[in-house]
């Protein structure tokens, strides 16, 4: 890309029609990185002109999702700015779009169309019956004088405002993601799109373009699904006599199997779902930056500062990116392991509180205990949301032992009960209760009993935690403390002895 003249201004303009799709976060991120790389401004604008699909509260949700990832805006609905308001419905109510509609009508670049939806459906069906592959509507009113159009409107007949597209020649633009390649559309293959609905509300094609011009956008970075609409936008810029911004259409993100794009309807791709599951903002930021962009083909872990410094559009690939949840999970694990113990405790505390294991916020004693527990799972953790399940037995008693899980390989119930009783007796007098003393005593006990470490330690692990997989045994016992460890050994011995007695009684 050539040298950029003047301050860069870009925007992310989502529609509040539900949760924010992770692909939308990627689009916002690319805009944000582009603005920050060139020292420009990133603007957030809410495009809520589709009344039928509007979902109350979704604008707040999408702003929260962006802020969670670490994307802040320089101007926007909640912080204002020199071009406020930044919500299209409010701009419509303020009458911002009306003079531009009049300008298009007066210049002959738009017209009032009185064709109803029912008539359009009939025309489509008739065209299909004739074997027409693509129905391209051009209303008869496009050739009427404006006075005649206004006279018809004065009778009360509903109408829309449509763009009067040319029927000859081509409309073209250059795309920065494709190296400035010139993309052409034959005008004869266009149709007269609606600019203003019968309700008077401008549609996306008109509203976003007027807003981009008034807000002085220099570049438009958006999904490549808008490539087919761009010739209409170019025609509108020409009709107004405005210079268009530079266009950059970003590659889609495909499902992991490559079969189609990520979809709100069929894929678990709500940005807030990753927040809820315990993905770190820095990990998500880093991973999304690599969805369609690459620095050198192999460097993947990059800080925000490095991404800002390195991000340019000539490194955005026009070919589709592919979503890889396993790679994202691994990257999240890398970022979790980079946290200090204190940072990990702060990060996982809300998840433990939500599970009812600690208070919100944690008490000083709870926080001190978490500082002891966090190192036990730090290396294993890939989602913060896993922390409650991994740590639950430290906060709640084990109540449902599986007798079979208590019995190690090549041992039976009787020998396991004897081993656990011996461990209980040895540990009852152990002081101090530390990792090193626990390890020394239990290893010595195992040798005395003629057991392999895996046998004794396996039985002790299940007795202490109720699980076959848990953090390192001696760290776990040290963190549980002596009284709780001894109580759990007693409980496990009782469960296993009772199960053994029942089996003997049946034989």
Curated annotation (Swiss-Prot):
GO terms for biological process: glutamyl-tRNA aminoacylation. One of its GO terms (molecular function) is ATP binding. One of its GO terms (cellular component) is cytosol. It is found in: Cytoplasm. It catalyses: tRNA(Glu) + L-glutamate + ATP = L-glutamyl-tRNA(Glu) + AMP + diphosphate. A motif ('KMSKS' region) lies at residues 261-265. CDD domains: GluRS_core. Its main location: cytoplasm. A motif ('HIGH' region) lies at residues 14-24. Belongs to the class-I aminoacyl-tRNA synthetase family. Glutamate--tRNA ligase type 1 subfamily. Monomer. Catalyzes the attachment of glutamate to tRNA(Glu) in a two-step reaction: glutamate is first activated by ATP to form Glu-AMP and then transferred to the acceptor end of tRNA(Glu). This is Glutamate--tRNA ligase. It comes from Roseiflexus castenholzii (strain DSM 13941 / HLO8). The lineage of its organism: Bacteria, Bacillati, Chloroflexota, Chloroflexia, Chloroflexales.
């Amino acid at each position: 890309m050539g040298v950029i003249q003047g301050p860069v201004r870009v925007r992310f303009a989502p529609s509040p029609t539900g949760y924010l799709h992770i692909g939308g976060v990627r689009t916002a991120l690319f805009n944000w990185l582009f603005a920050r790389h060139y020292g420009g401004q990133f603007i957030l604008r809410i495009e809520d002109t589709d009344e039928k699909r509007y979902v109350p509260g979704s604008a707040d949700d999408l702003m929260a999702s962006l802020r969670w990832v670490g994307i802040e805006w320089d101007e926007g609905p909640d912080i204002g700015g020199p071009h406020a308001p930044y919500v299209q419905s409010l701009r419509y109510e303020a009458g911002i779009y009306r003079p531009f509609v009049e300008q298009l009508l007066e210049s002959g670049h738009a017209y009032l169309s009185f064709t109803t939806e029912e008539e359009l459906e009939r025309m489509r069906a008739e065209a299909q019956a004739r074997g027409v592959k693509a129905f391209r509507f051009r209303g008869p009113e496009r050739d009427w004088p404006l006075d005649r159009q206004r006279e018809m409107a004065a009778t009360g007949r509903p109408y829309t405002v449509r763009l009067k597209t040319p029927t000859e020649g081509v409309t073209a633009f250059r795309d920065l993601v494709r190296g400035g390649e010139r993309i052409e559309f034959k005008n004869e293959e266009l149709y007269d799109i609606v600019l203003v609905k019968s309700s008077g509300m401008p549609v996306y094609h008109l509203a976003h373009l007027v807003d981009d011009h008034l807000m002085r956008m220099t570049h438009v970075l958006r999904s490549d699904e808008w490539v087919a609409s761009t010739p209409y936008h170019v025609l509108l810029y020409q009709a107004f006599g405005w210079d268009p911004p530079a266009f950059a259409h970003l590659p889609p993100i495909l499902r992991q199997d490559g079969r189609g794009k990520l979809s709100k309807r069929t894929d678990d791709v709500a940005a807030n779902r990753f927040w809820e599951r315990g993905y770190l903002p820095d990990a998500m930021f880093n991973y999304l930056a690599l969805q369609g962009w690459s620095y050198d083909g192999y460097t993947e872990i990059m800080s925000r500062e490095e991404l800002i410094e390195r991000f340019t559009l000539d490194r955005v690939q026009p070919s589709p990116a592919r979503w890889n949840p396993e790679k994202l999970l691994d990257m999240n694990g890398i970022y979790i392991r980079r946290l200090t113990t204190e940072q990990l405790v702060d990060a996982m505390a809300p998840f433990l509180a939500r599970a009812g294991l600690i208070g919100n916020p944690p008490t000083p004693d709870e926080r001190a205990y978490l500082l002891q527990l966090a190192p036990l799972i730090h290396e294993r953790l890939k989602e913060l949301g896993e922390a409650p399940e991994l740590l639950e037995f430290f906060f709640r008693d084990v109540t449902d032992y599986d007798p079979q899980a208590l019995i190690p390989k090549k041992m039976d119930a009787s020998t396991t009960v004897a081993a656990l009783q011996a461990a209980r007796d040895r540990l009852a007098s152990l002081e101090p209760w530390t990792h090193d003393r626990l390890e020394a005593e239990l290893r010595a006990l195992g040798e005395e009993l003629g057991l392999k470490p895996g046998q004794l330690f396996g039985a002790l692990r299940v007795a202490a935690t109720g699980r076959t997989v848990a953090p390192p045994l001696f760290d776990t016992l040290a963190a549980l403390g002596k009284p709780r460890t001894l109580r759990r050994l007693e409980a496990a011995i009782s469960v296993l002895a009772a199960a053994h007695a029942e089996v003997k009684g049946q034989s």
